[in-house]
């Protein structure tokens, strides 16, 4: 039998871009949620998140059907999840004064997302990596989207991972080869094949207009722990 315990947690007023010291400086927080967003830890514990909830290394963040979420990381990076998507924070580390400790390692498990890279992506590009079902994505300071159409089908498209770049560039690599993708270009990565350029697959990420508004610092975050 599954039980749910809800709690209200104080969320500190954090100056994310300032590289605040302490545990929160190496994580991120929920900026916006429309629908349902959960975070599952490695031990199986699941939390239902709300704006200002903290996210941590090891969390798998998942949106349900008809749900969107935006996560702000302490280095200034921003991740927007579309409905029915899962995204894991494999290892994130950032302290403004210690770039040698930078790390931004994540994985797209299902669905899709858009990411705007932050300070880790601009000053420590070799320490930024996003895993997908068919390749690993590295960046050169950028804004890009990634969609997994293997775990969940995308209407009218081949089963593959699709990537689109808005700004900057990325490099997608697997055991069969690699491909650089510049702004305005799109990529398809099928299982057992090298990454290659493709036409626009038409996979948009369109969060609610409310996501365009800044989130006020401080306040409270309401969370439910599902057991």
Residue ranges and their predicted role:
Residues 1-10:
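Bacterial N-terminal signal peptides that target proteins for export
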Residues 2-3, 19-20, 62:
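Intrinsically disordered/low-complexity terminal segments and short unstructured peptides
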Residues 9-19:
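Bacterial N-terminal signal peptides
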Residues 24-60, 64-69, 73-227:
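Flexible, surface-exposed loop/linker segments and immediately adjacent secondary-structure boundaries
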């Amino acid at each position: 039998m599954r039980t749910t315990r809800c709690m209200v947690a104080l969320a500190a007023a954090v100056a994310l871009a300032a590289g605040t010291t302490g545990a929160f400086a190496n994580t991120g927080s929920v900026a916006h949620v429309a629908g349902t967003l959960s975070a599952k830890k490695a031990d199986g514990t699941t939390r239902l998140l709300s704006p200002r909830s903290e996210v941590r290394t090891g969390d798998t963040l998942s949106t349900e059907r008809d749900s969107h979420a935006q996560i702000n990381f302490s280095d200034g990076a921003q991740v927007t999840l579309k409905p029915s998507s899962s995204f894991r924070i494999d290892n994130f580390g950032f302290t403004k004064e210690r770039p040698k400790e930078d790390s931004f390692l994540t994985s797209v498990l299902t669905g899709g997302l858009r990411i705007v890279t932050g300070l880790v992506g601009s000053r420590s590009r070799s320490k930024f990596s996003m895993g997908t079902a068919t390749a690993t994505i590295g960046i050169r300071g950028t804004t890009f989207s990634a969609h997994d159409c293997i775990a969940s089908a995308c209407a009218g498209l081949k089963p593959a991972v699709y990537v689109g770049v808005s700004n900057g560039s990325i490099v997608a690599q697997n055991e069969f080869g690699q491909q650089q993708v510049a702004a305005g270009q799109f990529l398809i990565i099928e299982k057992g094949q090298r990454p290659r350029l493709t036409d626009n697959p038409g996979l948009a990420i369109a969060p609610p207009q409310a996501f365009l508004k800044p989130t006020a610092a401080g306040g409270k975050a309401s969370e439910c722990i599902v057991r």
